[in-house]
């Protein structure tokens, strides 16, 4: 009986905690005006995510082969400086690092990238940024290319009932923590409607420094 009572109390406390967190999440979402779905345009078929890990070098020469002939691309960071950029014509471009929104030590390289995007993009392309940085990005990038569409992502962190998490993710009202831009591009790929997603250059070194004594 005691175990049953403890279990009931534990469940009640869990429901109470989730209710408070969920209410706080809704209040934050409403007051920060983050009620829009970033993914009003839907896509289908295959998409290849091209991150900037070392293994991408092996893939770059193959991007114009038949394997990728019916594939859309999502790229990130400085991919616009790659020679293959204007040949594969990516539909999606993700930027999450603050260096793309504010003056910084890499400002020269960033300005060069924006110049390339303004000058060379002659196809329709979406650029995705966190919603909190979109105004800074508009000013800092000074992009005026009519082919480029800016899409702001609701980066508010979901809190509350676990069963509702994916509803808010699916409708673009929240997203997983963008600890790396790779998280952002995977989120964009899955929420854009594609049935198949290929990952290239999504490498990490999280465990390289770990060892067992």
Predicted features and spans:
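Metal-ion/cofactor- or nucleotide/acyl-coenzyme-handling active-site neighborhoods
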Residues: 2-213
């Amino acid at each position: 009986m005691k175990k049953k009572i403890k279990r009931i109390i534990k469940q009640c406390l869990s429901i109470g905690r989730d209710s408070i967190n969920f209410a706080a999440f809704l209040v934050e979402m409403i007051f920060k005006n983050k009620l829009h779905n970033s993914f009003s345009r839907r896509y289908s078929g295959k998409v290849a995510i091209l991150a900037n890990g070392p293994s991408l070098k092996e893939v770059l020469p193959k991007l114009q082969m038949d394997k990728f002939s019916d594939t859309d691309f999502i790229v990130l960071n400085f991919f616009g400086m790659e020679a293959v950029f204007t040949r594969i014509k990516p539909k999606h471009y993700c930027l999450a690092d603050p260096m793309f929104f504010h003056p910084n030590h890499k400002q020269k390289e960033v300005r060069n990238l924006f110049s390339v995007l303004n000058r060379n993009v002659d196809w329709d392309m979406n650029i995705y940024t966190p919603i909190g940085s979109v105004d800074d990005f508009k000013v800092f990038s000074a992009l005026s290319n009519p082919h480029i569409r800016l899409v702001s992502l609701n980066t508010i962190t979901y809190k509350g009932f676990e069963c509702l998490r994916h509803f808010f993710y699916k409708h673009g009202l929240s997203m997983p923590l963008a600890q790396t831009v790779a998280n952002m591009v995977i989120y964009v790929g899955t929420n854009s409607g594609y049935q198949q997603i290929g990952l290239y250059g999504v490498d990490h070194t999280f465990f390289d420094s770990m060892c067992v004594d």
